[in-house]
Amino acid sequence: MIEVEITQEMIDEALFRASQVPALKNSDTNNHGTKIAALSDLMVQKTWGGRIVSDISYDFDWISPKYYLFEIKSKERNVEPKPWYNCSVKEYNTQQKCDYYLFTSIYGDYSRGWILGYLKKDEFFDKAVFFNKGDVDPDPRGDKYVFPSNCFNVKVEQLNCK
């Protein structure tokens, strides 16, 4: 896991990028997540280079310097991510044409974020556990998280990170 300091310049750019995105049909966050996603894209690009393409592709958000296609999945958090926290791909998003899923978290005040790690798409689904909307995470280390939508999940501790 890599912690990243978020600058005001990154926040301003993310807010602009988010303002250009139409309302999302299946948003669990009333499109607040669009801001978090834009900030996550920038955080990854500023840390590892590559190119953000989320504005032109539904299937992936970032092209790495080695030309791999990454779909970035982001969550807002009010605490530093723990190894047992879930990294999720919603059931309706499983057809995206990416090489990897990359997971990030953004602290609620936008002061910092974390690149949690990544998995190849097929490896993600080999390791993932499926939960239905309303299911409670059975992991005894957690706080009985209730899943807001049907999704596939791995734990942070299962991810690869540079």
Question: What are these language model-derived features?
Answer:
Residues 1-68, 73-162:
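Nucleic-acid endonuclease domains
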